[in-house]
Design a protein with these regions (language model features):
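Pan-zinc metallopeptidase signature
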Residues: 1-15, 19, 167-300
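N-terminal alpha-helical scaffold/docking segments in eukaryotic complex subunits
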Residues: 2-48, 132
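Hydrophobic (often cysteine-bearing) scaffold residues that line and stabilize catalytic clefts
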Residues: 53, 57, 112, 137, ...
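Post-HExxH zinc-binding segment in Zn-dependent metallohydrolases
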Residues: 134-169
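Auxiliary, metal-adjacent structural segments of Zn-dependent hydrolase domains
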Residues: 27-93, 104-108
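A structural motif
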Residues: 111-118, 151-156
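Active-site recognition of the HExxH zinc-binding catalytic motif
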Residues: 113-129, 146
Length: 300
């Protein structure tokens, strides 16, 4: 939790974020991801200063448990002084003890954001899905929280001006915006209408631009002229290698590989789930991602 300190910006964790999206689809399946098409509604996690602190926190926790479809999980929320925003004991259940930073006693509107992250820890724990190392596992948790419909709360908790700053989670604001945009493109929603933080709008716009760049990489037909020109040059070079292929290439997401005695093939990440797709190099090709079922128009 950045509280008054510097806030990191940009996309320093993008590789892990993309791996997290792929891992979600692999562990949950396309059909399960689709059940999260509706995001947490602002009214369901609203918390005003006149609400009872403990009753309100329990109400918000129950709503997030319902959203993540953990009907037999019960969260017991308490507050104490700590350096982190929150903590959850990942026991066998069904009761899970969540501690929130004392700061939330007076910053109640962000309690939903903190609880969204902690309830996702419980969800991933039950799934048996984790990444090695605290940093990568927290990035997975932030990404899953956002992609499955509650992470807009975390981005909305980001506020920064010349005198102060606040940010929850391990992702940068722009990375939260990127995952939100990925979700928005899949489910055709506009999370920006829920933001109360002006800085959240800016971060979301930058994340959306990065997400759209994923959809404009060769060999996708939406690629721009510069990308298409680089792709054509790399393809010629790979074909000149006497069917040994060029393998991975620096600075681009695609790679050319031989296919025995058959045509050269190109692999590239699906812009939706980041799973790599491999298709023959033979002009216009329509590919379907086997993981997220996205249909892609390609010019190989």
């Amino acid at each position: 939790m950045a509280n008054g300190g510097p806030v990191q910006h940009g996309f320093p964790h993008l590789e892990t974020v993309r791996a997290s999206i792929t891992a979600l689809y692999k562990r949950l399946s396309y059909d399960t991801v689709q059940t999260f098409a509706t995001s947490v509604a602002p009214a369901d996690v609203a918390f005003c200063d006149t609400d009872d602190l403990y009753l309100g926190a329990q109400r918000v926790a129950r709503e997030l448990v319902r959203h993540y479809r953990l009907p037999d999980a019960r969260l017991i929320v308490s507050f104490r002084e700590m350096s982190h925003a929150a903590n959850v004991e990942l026991a066998a259940g069904p009761e899970y003890f969540v501690e929130l930073n004392d700061r939330f006693r007076t910053h109640r509107r962000d309690i939903g954001a903190a609880l969204a992250h902690e309830v996702m820890h419980v969800y991933l724990h039950r799934l048996g899905l984790s990444f090695p190392g605290t940093r990568d596992n927290e990035i997975l948790t932030d990404t899953a929280t956002t992609y499955l419909g509650a992470g807009w709360l975390l981005l909305d908790a980001y506020r920064e001006d010349a005198a102060s700053s606040q940010k929850l989670g391990y992702l940068t604001p722009e990375e939260f915006g990127y995952v939100l945009a990925k979700r928005a493109l899949v489910f055709a929603e506009d999370p920006s209408v829920w933001f109360t933080s002006p800085q959240a709008y800016t971060a979301y716009a930058k994340g959306l631009a990065e997400a759209r760049r994923d959809e404009q990489q060769p060999p996708l037909t939406a690629a721009g002229w510069v990308g298409r020109r680089r792709y054509a040059r790399d393809r010629r070079h790979a074909q000149d290698q006497d069917h040994h292929g060029a393998g991975a290439l620096p600075g681009v997401p695609y790679a050319f590989t031989p296919d025995g005695r058959g045509p050269l093939r190109v692999s590239f990440p699906c812009p939706t789930c980041q799973q790599r797709i491999r298709v023959p190099v033979r002009g216009r090709v329509r590919a379907r991602c086997g993981l997220c079922r996205t249909v892609l128009e390609c010019d190989t």
